[in-house]
Amino acid sequence: MDRALRLLARSRCLSRVPASAPGPGPGSSPSGVSRLLLRPPNAARMASQNSFRIEYDTFGELKVPNDKYYGAQTVRSTMNFKIGGVTERMPIPVIKAFGILKRAAAEVNQDYGLDPKIANAIMKAADEVAEGKLNDHFPLVVWQTGSGTQTNMNVNEVISNRAIEMLGGELGSKKPVHPNDHVNKSQSSNDTFPTAMHIAAAVEVHEALLPGLQKLHDALDAKSREFAQIIKIGRTHTQDAVPLTLGQEFSGYVQQVKYAITRIKAAMPRIYELAAGGTAVGTGLNTRIGFAEKVAAKVAALTGLPFVTAPNKFEALAAHDALVELSGAMNTTACSLMKIANDIRFLGSGPRSGLGELILPENEPGSSIMPGKVNPTQCEALTMVAAQVMGNHVAVTVGGSNGHFELNVFKPMMIKNVLHSARLLGDAAVSFTENCVVGIQANTERINKLMNESLMLVTALNPHIGYDKAAKIAKTAHKNGSTLKATAVELGYLTAEQFDEWVKPKDMLGPK
């Protein structure tokens, strides 16, 4: 029986040997079978460990992938905050902003005595972070500590290990460049993360949001001028009102976008104030006199934006009213764009059963069942963006209100939503401009028909026959389905000649 069991075990081992297994080499055991039998049971696990290195934080050792520059604290964060997946990672603009900040801090720290060799390596590695060359080494999600400490350490570890590599050292050794002692020198997560937030927000506003809104403003302004001589009926409460020009109607949209740009720019001076130098609670512990001012100046030079040190670091760490203010300006912008997009799609409704005063560009098929149907898709996309921005602002508002004592602890969520709003509004403004606004045409035949049929032209008679008689004309004409002119003459309130003289749409476009 024992012999049978041994034979069975041997046959099972033989079945596990791959056909391509190499023959015995010098000094090897006599067969592939014996090599397999002699291999320790955890050999596969040990072999897989070759792709990892061991790093340490204050809680102990962790395995870190050899192809990543981050370290133990980043790995621990990925273990502790498995929330949302890849789509919820810290926004890349924040990571790039950290690269700018860490470079500036290293340069200033060198002025205060940091070894130039270490400082230069940090600066080079930080530049790579700022340029987006190391994006794959930042796996952390937004949903972490409210101060952003894990992301600050992720940045410190990546820059440290990349700098170590540049200097020919061993990844994970923290020598000669230490993530805390050197990369994070004179800094705390409590002041670096809000600094990165402001840098990221300012860059996004200048690179995406303001250019997009300016493009939309200019296109709407061009349409306002193009439509300046087209007289149409106005509408209030969605009901017919007195005339105006299509150009005047569009001029309202132009002014809304102009004010949106003005509001956003007005919020920026507070965004340009940087918390760097406040360290843990705003006192500047472990920094040198002048560090905060010098870092802000370096960041300004690196970005070309007028950053300055925050005049009060306690406010800069504990409250993020500046981000709430900027988000509020974007929320107002979203309200404006919602109105503009809705007006344009309603004025373009039809083509035969709607208002039909505007002819909108036809960009793609609109229905999977109704042949030939085309929809106002750019308007719909813009209104959805507006709704999202409004929702983002609610989250930012709640986050901004949660500054507890010396620290706000909703930082990652706040900047995620601020950046999301800025990017969405900027991109949507460009898309709406290029794919809708520039191609809008006026349907003058339809506009003239609706204007001539409107009962509200009777308003021009008020100064001549009084409100009550004018109202009687309008109501009688509506009830009988007759024209204003015929009804006015029939009621004996005026002659046909008087009606033609007093009721002229072109004379109803402004004060006299």
From Swiss-Prot:
Modified residues (Phosphothreonine): 87, 238
Record HAMAP family: FumaraseC
Role according to the record: Catalyzes the reversible stereospecific interconversion of fumarate to L-malate. Experiments in different species have demonstrated that specific isoforms of this protein act in defined pathways and favor one direction over the other.
NCBIfam families documented for this protein: fumC_II (TIGR00979), PRK12273.1 (NF008909)
Modified-residue entries (N6-succinyllysine), positions: 63, 68, 82, 117, 124, 294, 469, 475
Protein's recorded name: Fumarate hydratase, mitochondrial
Lineage start: Eukaryota, Metazoa, Chordata, Craniata, Vertebrata
Biological process per Gene Ontology, one example term: arginine metabolic process
Active-site residues, Swiss-Prot/TrEMBL: 237 (proton donor/acceptor), 367
Region span, Disordered: 17-36
GO CC annotations, alphabetized: chromosome; cytosol; mitochondrion; nucleus
Complex and partners: Homotetramer. Interacts with H2AZ1.
Endpoints of the signal sequence: none
Binding site residues for substrate: 147-149, 178-181, 188-190, 236, 368, 373-375
Family: Belongs to the class-II fumarase/aspartase family. Fumarase subfamily.
Gene3D superfamilies: Fumarase/aspartase (C-terminal domain), Fumarase/aspartase (Central domain), Fumarase/aspartase (N-terminal domain)
Interval spanned by the transit peptide: 1-46
Alphabetized Pfam families for the sequence: FumaraseC_C, Lyase_1
Misc note: There are 2 substrate-binding sites: the catalytic A site, and the non-catalytic B site that may play a role in the transfer of substrate or product between the active site and the solvent. Alternatively, the B site may bind allosteric effectors.
The enzyme's E.C. designation: 4.2.1.2
Record-level Gene Ontology MF annotations: fumarate hydratase activity
Site annotation Important for catalytic activity: residues: 380
Cross-referenced SUPFAM superfamilies: L-aspartase-like
